[in-house]
A protein has these predicted regions:
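A short acidic, glycine-rich active-site loop
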Residues: 53-66
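Structural beta-alpha unit
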Residues: 72-113, 210-261, 269, 276-288
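Short beta-strand elements of ligand-binding domains
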Residues: 116-117, 142-148, 271-275
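Charged helix-capping and loop-helix junction motifs
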Residues: 128-131, 202-204, 255-260
């Protein structure tokens, strides 16, 4: 069974992403591991010689009580979505969020991470400084990032950006594995710039190789890569965007307000970020 880590702070953004996590678990036949982290304040025990441990025990207990109170709410949401059969377990950890996420990924052999984000400027705020934006560059497993505005709906069209590289072909096959489970279509975009070195022969070979798959290729000549991707998301009605090995700065530029303000709905779709580092084989992970 595939293991999906769902870090949560029980905020509205996290609760919204929880529904996506449940649906994703259903698709890949997985289980959810809910993680809540908290930071204990640093005290100098020379000033609290007698009650130092009492203070920490009290803080830890209050965190546990809050965690314990929230779990039934999530289980109620699962029941409302008719997904209460999805196996769920829980972890409550103190310390740094990213450190704990990486620790759980290693200890529990996590296959995917699903995490919510929120911000007035949508993805721009997300990639510039939120916890989710930091996590996406720190882990080596696929991560589904869900903005607060992205209410769950059936995914019919998956967008995938490519530069026709060998590693892109491998990733596309992996995306197709997911798409078939969702009964969705993949729309593959290549933005052909004036300096592009991809030959027509390569493009035709890909067309032939994937002819029997649920994939439509679009080659759009433009030197405005980010703007073209945003247009593609809007006009092809993309429900989920999949991107491979892009750096954080690329996402910041792609989803900055100046680009997305005229297309409000581009900041309300989930993004599945695939990691280039082959710590685990995504296709094996995705297969159920």
């Amino acid at each position: 069974m595939k293991k999906i880590l769902f870090p949560t702070d029980f905020s509205p953004a996290a609760t919204n992403a929880f529904i996506h996590a449940l649906e994703f678990a259903k698709i890949v036949q997985g289980e959810l591991i809910l993680l809540h982290t908290f930071d204990l304040p640093i005290y100098d025990n020379q000033y609290f010689p007698e009650n130092y441990n009492v203070i920490f025990d009290s803080l830890q207990l209050s965190q546990f009580d809050a965690f314990k109170d929230e779990i039934p709410k999530l289980r109620a949401i699962a029941e409302e979505q008719n997904l209460d059969k999805i196996k769920m377990s829980h972890r409550l950890m103190d310390g740094d969020l990213i450190y704990n996420i990486k620790k759980v990924i290693k200890e529990d052999k996590i296959d995917f991470v699903v995490m919510g984000t929120a911000g007035e400027t949508g993805w721009g705020t997300f990639f510039l400084g939120t916890n989710t934006g930091s996590v996406i560059n720190a882990i080596d497993v696929p991560m589904l990032s869900v903005p607060l505005e992205a209410k769950f709906k059936k995914i019919k069209t998956i967008g995938f950006t490519t530069r026709y590289r060998t590693k892109d072909k491998k990733a596309l096959k992996e995306v197709i594995t997911i798409a078939k489970k969702m009964n969705a279509q993949v729309r593959c975009l290549y933005v052909k710039t004036s300096t592009s070195d991809v030959s027509e022969t390569t493009i035709k070979k890909w067309d032939t190789e994937f002819a029997k798959e649920p994939v439509i290729f679009s080659v759009i000549p433009s030197d405005e890569i980010k703007e073209t991707i945003i247009d593609f998301i809007l006009f092809k009605e993309i429900d989920l965007l999949v991107m491979l090995a892009y750096k954080r700065n690329f996402f910041v530029e792609l989803f900055k307000p100046s680009l997305t303000e005229k297309f409000a709905n581009t900041s309300s779709i989930p993004i599945l970020a695939l990691r280039e580092k082959k710590s685990r084989n995504f296709e094996e992970v995705a297969a159920g």
